[in-house]
Regions:
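Short, small/acidic-rich helices and loops at N termini and domain boundaries
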Residues: 1-8, 75-78, 241-254
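Non-catalytic accessory segments of DNA primases and related replication-initiation nucleases
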Residues: 1-63, 225
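A broad structural signal for alpha-helix termini and local helix breaks/kinks
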Residues: 6, 64-65, 169, 221
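Short, basic/aromatic recognition patches
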Residues: 66-89
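Short clusters of hydrophobic/aromatic residues that line enzyme substrate/ligand-binding pockets
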Residues: 73, 143, 239
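Phosphate-handling DNA/RNA-contact segment within nucleic-acid enzymes
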Residues: 82-190
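TOPRIM fold recognition
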Residues: 150-151, 159, 163-256
Length: 256
């Protein structure tokens, strides 16, 4: 039973992260951190649901996203921003956790925000991505926005692009964080129809990753009966641009 399988994954995530989704009352206090992995896990433990933060709601609503993601996307008020060993200051932050096929945390992704948009940090990035895997291994993983096992599932690169696709097409969507991880993504066995929502990149990174994913799923995931490819018609855009600006979308289907 695939729903039972998802439930087992949730137990693994809860055991590792340390709280029950939807019930912060039972959230344990962060333990003493001995490694970067521990520090990141503790950071996630200190976060709060997005619905409890006006700043988080404003950030997503400014992007046309009103269905707030739950589960593995949360909020941290006034998180320290470090540039190497220098403390630059504090900013509110959206923290998300990408998990692998076994439900284990693989990456923590942090977006620093200010005044309803990404924080302006000069030439320093407003986003940071931290691996939780040993020895630099890059596992197949994604950010899950809800506890469900849908037969029709979409996958996109960035979090905002994935949530925008979900908003437009009312299809449960996951985010892989970048093109490299999109290429390596594999859908769970309960998925019968996979939508690949790719970025229309100037240098073709998003399109290339999407095509490689389509080929891999067609060859190695016999449980997937249909693949739907969708991308913005305008170069240099993603599905958040489609949502906000009503851009046209190119669609192609593959059926087994």
């Amino acid at each position: 039973n695939m729903l039972n399988a998802v439930g087992a994954e949730l137990k693994d995530i809860n055991r590792e992260i340390g709280f029950k989704y939807g019930d912060d009352r039972d959230k344990p206090q962060p333990a003493r951190a001995r490694t970067t992995h521990d520090k990141l896990i503790n950071l996630f433990k200190s976060s709060i649901p997005l619905r409890e933060s006006e700043h988080a709601r404003e950030y997503f609503q400014n992007r046309g996203i009103y269905g707030l993601p739950g589960y593995m996307v949360r909020f941290i008020p006034q998180l320290e921003y470090w540039n190497k060993k220098e403390l630059i200051g504090k900013r509110d932050a959206i923290i998300s956790c990408a998990t692998n096929a076994l439900g284990r945390p693989a990456y923590m992704h942090i977006t620093y925000i200010e005044d309803g948009k990404k924080a302006d940090l000069g030439d320093m990035p407003s986003r940071k991505m931290h691996s939780l895997s040993p020895n630099g291994v890059r596992p197949r993983c994604s950010i899950k926005f809800a506890n469900q096992a849908p037969e029709i599932l979409a996958v996109a690169e960035g979090m905002e692009s994935a949530l925008s696709y979900q908003e437009i097409y009312k299809t449960p969507t996951e985010a892989t964080l970048n093109a490299g991880l999109l290429e390596e993504y594999r859908p769970p066995e309960y998925v019968k129809e996979l939508h690949i929502a790719y970025d229309n990149d100037k240098k073709w990174a998003g399109q290339s990753a999407a095509n490689k994913l389509k080929h891999a799923v067609a060859c190695r995931c016999p449980w997937v009966q249909k693949i739907v490819m969708r991308g913005s018609l305008e170069t240099g855009t993603d599905f958040n641009d489609v949502l906000l600006d009503g851009l046209g979308v190119e669609t192609s289907d593959w059926i087994r």
